[in-house]
Amino acid sequence: MYPEIMLVPMREELTRIGIEETRTADAVDDAVRGTEGTLMVVVNSVCGCAAGKMRPGIRRAFDHATKPARSITVFAGQDGEATDRARGYFTGYPPSSPSIGFLREGQLVHMIQRSDIETRTADQIEALLTQAFDQYCGATAGAKS
């Protein structure tokens, strides 16, 4: 584990734009149960691809007109209980950090793994996210056709 003082700026990059920090398993479960619409779950990390790609991509994507109903973050390697619980919702995917999952009614509908993040630029991650926002977070997201 890293000293918390080192993590504050990494946490604040996301909380500053309105992403809620969840540090316990109960807080993660409460967010999943308490969200109508799409919940974006960000697994934050100290690694370079989180710092140089994922967090900047998320910040830029949050300028998009369509966004998740709610967004939360856990910090891998620091908030173990919360991270494990969040990953428990990422059915069918191995643990990876950083990563971003999209849940509707507690079910995973879209996943962006570390392998998707580390091979892209922040601009490309922004594009991935805005596409996911449009597909899973818009007014017609989840509508049966």
Curated annotation (Swiss-Prot):
InterPro entries recorded: BrxB/BrxA
One BP term from GO: cell redox homeostasis
Family indicated by similarity: Belongs to the bacilliredoxin family.
Name the record gives this protein: Bacilliredoxin Acid345_1880
Organism: Koribacter versatilis (strain Ellin345)
